[in-house]
Amino acid sequence: MKTNIIILLISLVFTFQLNAQTLNKEIAIEGETPYLLGKIDKSGLENENYTSWFTKNLKEYQPNQSVITEISTELKTYTIKLFMGTWCGDSKKEVPRFYKVLEACDYPMEQLTVVAVSRKPNMYKQSPQHEEAGLNIHRVPTIIFYKDNKEVNRIVEHPIKSFEEDIQNIIEKNDYKSNYQIVTAVDNILKKKGTKGLNRKTKKLLKTYEGKVTSMFELNTYGRILYGTDRIEEAIAVFTLNTKLFPNEPRSYMSLANTLGVSGQKEKAIVVLEKAINLHPENDDLKENLEMIKTN
């Protein structure tokens, strides 16, 4: 009996040490800026490599106290997941402000999960344990609010008004629309109907979002996320949609063609680039891209 208790205690200590080791893991490569990766907490952001921006932006932000008073009680009934990058300018600006709002609300930090993601091409906006899997994390920071283990809403990249006002909308009316609504719409279609469903919905999406999407990078970044997680067919479908939404943007065609090329669809890639060159005959990047595809 005593032996079993000792073994159990050793196992618990080992588990605790393992968890402690994986929290606030820093990746430090010679010649590169260090960054946090995986689950982190506030103490990790107060580390010497991050405190210059975290502490400064935390102190400078002054939440609207009247809104804080209105949201603080109800906010405690939600759990929150926050995905960020310590390498990301938006995360450096917005995450300290979000912490300031949570602290002003006396929010229980054990209900907050913070995950730092990578910017490396083979792990783009992913974490080692893939806490982001299936959550459509295409921009950071992304803050997801849960009630009874179900997603209620999210704030993407930056608040529409302010964190406290956006949170108030989410917990009171919940007619809140975060940034990058076209990505949300496309992701929902892919999850429910796949690429065939996206193809069927293309005309409707173009009619709904034409002129409302700020740049080709809204869908382009999302396509990169899909490609990086081996959802190749879906990435190609998204890049194809992007060429229709931004026909005057040569880079939209290059993203599609390069993805087709690396996935063994060389002839289709050539067709895409030749069409783009007909539309943009003066663009040397398209011509170079076509030559590269043809010779590989």
Region roles according to the model:
Residues 139, 144-183:
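Non-catalytic, surface beta->alpha helical segment in thiol-disulfide oxidoreductase systems
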Residues 111-145, 163-171:
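Thioredoxin-like thiol-disulfide oxidoreductase module
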Residues 228, 262, 292-296:
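Register position in tetratricopeptide repeats
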